[in-house]
Amino acid sequence: MNARIAFEINELPLFFLSHKNGRKTLEVEAFDGLLAASVQYDYERRPLTLKSEIKLGDKVEIILLSHRIELYVNGTLMDEEWPAGKALFEMGDGFVPEMQISVSEYAEDGATPPSVVSTFENAEGWYPGNGVFVGDCMPYRRADEYHVLYLKDRHQHGSKWGLGAHQWEHISTRDFKTWKVHPMAVAITDPREGSICTGSWIEKDGIEYLHYTVRMGRGIPAPIRRSVSTDGYHFVKDENFGFTVSEQYHRESARDPKVIKAEDGLYHMFLTTSLVKENKGCLAHYVSRDMESWEDFGAPIYVSADATQPECPDYFFYNGKYYLIFSLHGKAHYMISDKPFEGFVMPEDPIIPCRSVPKGAEWNGKLIFTGFRRIGGYGGAMTFKAATSKENGELVFEDL
């Protein structure tokens, strides 16, 4: 069902609902300057609720799609949610009390957006606003551009009944002053997608790949998926690609794949998960010759001392040293080695001082880390930190 429900705020307070079989299917109430629209689904007893400030004379639209619902006030998107299962409200259902409400079929805009949607100045402390915050960041360098993919967060990780319903947004810069906003890189397009989790970017033979896991919870293994692009701005999901980690790992919590190509000619993937038998968090290590078929390397590249899962792994070679990065309880730690994939040791101070779960990319000879500063919950504002290295590999941090 793709439906558009439209009405005008002609009086306050306002209330109407639709119900059948003794159960509310859709409910709208507005008072004290706030409107709440609740939609019920067969997936969960609790409804999904959209909210916005409201006043007399405002024109309201509620858009119901199978994978997303939206609340517009006077043509501006004020809130959105991402359902699962089937909406109990159907076209043709009535409302009580009777009032002037328009219900019609709704067609999504299928036009391809331009590669640059808008621009803004200075990303330090930036977030999109209007209820949208920055989550985990995934930076990479392409030629002379520094790109940041980040998790779009509404409701402080509370969307989709707490699954998060995160999607990947995309910005870039050439000077860290003016930033370009690009089309959404990975969107939720299926109600079976609970959240597009953190991942990584890689280029191969002129094609750009984004690897991530799709989480749905309820004991369902999280598959590793990917999206591809020929221009670096418009990504399409590869419906033919996907796999889950082996049973020695906790499959439901597998996430945050970091993919790199190494000197051995192989592609390596590191994933956040846990060893089931040992009950210890770890970074699983997978390898591939072609980025199509992946095999377990045999042992994790890192195992925690306890059940804490090392999140958002990063890996790179910089100034003659190999670096393995991961976050514990939101704080990023780095390890150093002279050899790839082994022999990593933590320096005396292993913390990367860039707030929550930062990852890095080399730019103009320095490592530039991107993280986010929380604002009132999970999501927040983007933040950066630059770093160079000492001869022993220890990083020296400075403000960007």
Question: Which residues make up each language-model segment?
Answer:
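Basic DNA-binding region of bZIP-type proteins
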Residues: 67
